[in-house]
Regions:
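Tryptophan-rich substrate-binding surfaces of secreted polymer-degrading and adhesive proteins
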Residues: 1-205, 280-282, 371, 376-380, ...
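Conserved, function-critical positions that sit in or immediately flank catalytic
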Residues: 156-506
Length: 506
């Protein structure tokens, strides 16, 4: 996940969320299409052929920036009466977490988000070797102090450590019923709250690494009725100490870390000053990640997922509002049309366009259009028709030239001319739609990037036209498709915006 974020931040790269495939059910099935697409949407195929066809049917794309990416963790809302697991560094197959039986920390229920979108890690849940599941949580943590604390006066035994608050802007973009979004720039953020938590978690400065010593076995026969006996935590770090209490039988009943120390990856409690027991105790210093709780948030919470956000609205003619789409993809480093240079602009149109005159009828989105040209017939599928500007947008994919009966490379009559993918021409030959009755002529006299059809308002067309024709802004098939998802067909309109949220797991 971190590597992906870094590559997006790298100015040498350009990532785009792309919408495509206006006609997933017709007029020709095969080539990734299906008559039952909307009721039984197929999964994308993992093949170069499938990806190439998806590239042919792209409509438009919007650039991904670091502002539109967040690391994610599984959402766990605090709920009264729920037992949560405490953070431990040693969950494994041999030592699964006691409530969820997780063999790794990141699957355990060791953090929560409260009603205010504050996120906390559980330092203590009142558990021990004789009560491994701990207590039910009764007090919702709401504090934002940087030191671990109990959340209320119920005596539930919980100690919580505040980590961060999801800001309102991230709630709007990245909120999900399944995931919590994590701040994007934790190691470098100068936001006061984040900086305070991060710096407090640096035990090389604060000598506060270890927060909890877990009583796995109480032992028996240590010095009786000890209160506040401070002993050392020894290991590969330095400076940690814990205060021990014992009962009338010499059992260890309580531990309280008085100095967290620094530099530990393991530790043992030195009980040599508490007498000679008949049964020895087992106390486990819980080792935080990195330098301490809150210092390296991504490591502490296991942020192995990302959410990529993009909003498509009607603010530009690159995103026509009358189109449909059934595929969503992320592509890396498409190249500018007619060039090998990486496309870097905020958005692109990946379809061809025709400025028409004398239209009759209204075309259907997704239907085939044709024009007689030199060498045969140009063909395409309509993506959009703007009645204000008289601009037809279309794409061309291999289904237009393959065998129309078998939907593949089977030989057919007329293959010599019909299998050629020909471009539409700026000529007097009409554009004719296959089913709707729509016809129109190419506006051969139109050149430019804007039009003023009523004489009162200049409308930007998004792409530059030459003699009535416009090319895509990226080279067909350029860029690497790193994510592809099929959806039931979605119809756009001028009153809606599409918020696309893509979850990537690493």
């Amino acid at each position: 996940a971190n590597n992906f974020v870094e590559t997006v931040d790298n100015s040498a790269n350009s990532y785009y969320v792309v919408l495509g495939l206006t006609n997933p059910t017709s007029p020709t099935v095969g080539f990734g299409r299906s008559t039952t697409w909307n009721t039984n949407t197929p999964s994308p195929e993992d093949s170069f052929n499938y990806m190439n066809n998806a590239g042919d049917t792209q409509i438009f794309g919007k650039k991904v920036t670091s502002d539109n990416i967040r690391r994610l963790i599984t959402r766990r809302n605090w709920a009264q009466g729920t037992r949560y697991e405490m953070y431990r560094h040693d969950y494994s197959i041999a030592n699964p977490s006691p409530i969820t039986s997780s063999s790794r920390l990141y699957d355990a229920s060791y953090y929560v988000m409260n009603k205010n979108f504050n996120v906390y890690v559980c330092i203590d849940n009142g558990s021990s070797g004789i009560s491994t599941t701990g207590n039910a949580s009764q007090d919702e943590p709401v504090f934002t102090d940087i030191e671990p604390s109990r959340a209320g006066e119920s005596g539930d035994g919980y100690i919580w450590k505040y980590l961060f608050t999801v800001p309102p802007s991230d709630i709007i973009k990245f909120d999900s019923t399944e995931y919590i979004s994590v701040p994007s720039d934790w190691p470098t953020s100068t936001t006061t709250q984040i900086q305070s938590v991060r710096e407090n978690g640096d035990s090389t400065i604060n000598n506060n690494q270890i927060k909890k010593v877990y009583i796995d076995q109480q032992g028996f026969g240590y010095t009786q009725n000890q209160t506040g006996k401070e002993v050392d935590i020894i290991g590969d770090g330095t400076g940690a100490k814990v205060v021990i209490d014992t009962d009338s039988e010499g059992k260890i009943t309580k531990t309280n870390v008085s100095s967290g120390g620094q530099g530990y990856t393991y530790g043992m409690v030195d009980l040599g000053t508490l007498g000679t027991p008949s049964t020895r105790a087992k106390l486990i210093p819980i080792i935080p990640p990195s330098k301490g709780h809150g210092f390296d948030l991504y490591k502490e919470l296991g942020t192995d997922k990302l959410l990529v956000y993009a909003r498509f609205d009607d603010s530009t003619k690159d995103f026509p509002t009358d189109t449909k789409f059934a595929q969503i993809s992320i592509i890396k480093n498409p190249t500018s049309i007619g060039s090998t240079a990486t496309f870097t602009t905020n958005q692109f149109s990946s379809v061809n366009a025709i400025k028409v005159i004398s239209p009759t009828g209204t075309p259907t989105i997704g239907e085939k259009i044709e024009q007689t040209v030199t060498g045969g017939t140009a063909k395409g599928y309509i993506v959009s028709y703007d009645t204000d500007t008289n601009v037809v947008k279309y794409y061309q994919d291999r289904s237009l030239v393959f065998n129309q009966t078998t939907g593949d490379q089977t030989d057919y009559v007329g293959v010599t001319t019909n299998s050629k993918m020909l471009n539409f021409a700026s000529s007097a030959d009409k554009i004719i739609a296959s089913t709707s009755g729509f016809t129109a002529s190419v506006d051969q006299n139109f050149t430019g990037i804007s039009t003023n059809p009523t004489g009162n308002k200049v409308i930007s067309l998004g792409v530059n036209f030459e003699s009535g024709l416009a090319s895509p802004e990226i080279n067909k098939g350029s860029g690497e498709i790193i994510y592809l998802d099929n959806r039931p067909l979605i119809t756009r309109n001028s009153r809606q915006k599409e918020d696309i949220k893509i979850i990537l797991e690493f």
